[in-house]
Amino acid sequence: MEISRQFVRQKNPCTDGFRWFMRHFQEGSDYQPLLDALVAAGRVSDACWLMDQFGPTKAVLEVDALEAEAVVFAGSLLVRGPIEVDSVLRIGGSLRAESGIRVGRRLQLGADLWAAGNVRSLGSLHVDGDVRADWNLLVGERLDCGGDLRVGWDVEVGTECTIGGQTAVGGDVAVGAALK
């Protein structure tokens, strides 16, 4: 998807973000390279805003492991090893991890989450679809699950927990505030 100057302007971006876009991409850019450039420049919130405006893609990325400060990917992601992200992991589609997931601040997905190990977000976890963690699910702040929640062992949520579908947990459940 080509993102032009006019296309971005129609979405009413912040002045600083639009100036950055014009300095770096005067002729426009493809969607994912623009998201990557924003993240590399430390403009993670701008990359998330852009994804809010333009939505997910059907792209699928497969990697052996993922270790980064922040990741914003518009498609779906398959990771064969561990995932370690210091701040934000934002995926437009689904995330499948054949190991554990650790995110420092926020984990947000536009579809389903499946992890063969622990899922740990020190901040919030927002998943529009189903969540499946074969081990523990540990969320430091708020959990929003739009679909079913299936966890092999324990669930621990620091504040509020909202689940849109059915819940199956193999161990204990601890929620710091309301469970909806």
Where are these regions (language model features)?
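Short, glycine-biased loop/turn motifs at secondary-structure junctions and
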Residues: 1-180
